[in-house]
Design a protein with these regions (language model features):
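Aromatic-lined, polymer-binding surfaces characteristic
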Residues: 1-148
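CBM-like carbohydrate-recognition segments
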Residues: 152-240
Length: 240
């Protein structure tokens, strides 16, 4: 429901004004989302945080298409809570409890060896698809909100830019920078980066040298495979 909803709902919003799509057909799709997707997205996942963030992305995109303010606001609330329990800043101190952590944050975070700015709940699980999917979905949700006039980005700029730069450094160097017992970074790359870079660098003017280097040397030239809801970022947000 998360990955599919995060694709279907934005596509439906783009197609809403298509003259060949009758109003009753739009209403049928809205009803399908309410019937099939709402129950699946209604509560926070107790799995790892990338799953919940994907659900939040879908939830907010569907809320826009369905013109459902209550669902949209619930998505924002979930986004804010998960952001603080998934993306770490040293200034946070203790990580807040979250559904699924088993009352053991150290184990839930796969036993980091250093709690540093930009660490994620799944950095030490793998900083391949799990951690990259998580930040991709979180940023997609923030972008949905941005286009509805709600700025989720600015209040969490330190948190998200730290995550981008740490993860990009790890992926560029192949070295986890001492954050995990296994110091070898993933070689898997996904189209996770352009939306965040576009906002924080192009809109806000924040320097993100490692993120830029990763995008320019690894992401754009190699066209990472599209997977689930990570598919379109360079096309829509690279600013070509």
């Amino acid at each position: 429901a998360g990955w599919i909803g995060a694709i279907f709902a934005p596509a439906a919003e783009i197609m809403r004004a298509y003259p060949g799509w009758a109003a009753e057909d739009v209403e049928k799709l809205q009803a399908m989302f309410r019937r099939a997707f709402y129950p699946q997205l209604d509560r926070a996942s107790s799995w790892n945080g990338n799953v919940d963030l994907t659900q939040i992305d879908a939830m907010m995109a569907i809320a826009v298409f369905n013109e459902d303010i209550e669902l949209f606001n619930a998505g924002i609330e979930r986004w804010q809570k998960r952001t603080h329990s998934y993306f770490y800043l040293e200034s946070d101190g203790e990580v807040p409890a979250i559904s699924g952590d088993g009352n053991n944050v150290q184990s839930f975070w796969s036993k980091p060896t250093a709690w540093v700015d930009g660490l994620t709940q799944e950095t030490c699980r793998d900083n391949g698809h799990h951690a990259q999917f998580a930040i991709g979905s979180a940023i997609h949700a923030a972008e949905v909100a941005w286009h509805q006039g709600v700025d989720l980005y600015t209040g969490e700029s330190e948190r998200y830019t730290a995550t981008l730069e740490l993860m990009a450094t790890q992926l560029l160097t192949g070295d986890m920078q001492g954050t995990c017992a296994d110091n070898t970074a993933s070689k898997s790359l996904f189209d996770t980066w352009e939306v965040a870079y576009n906002h924080y660098h192009n809109r806000m003017g924040i320097d993100l040298p490692q993120t830029r280097a990763l995008i320019e040397t690894k992401i754009r030239p190699n066209a990472p495979r599209a997977v689930w809801n990570l598919a379109y970022e360079t096309l829509t947000h690279a600013g070509f």
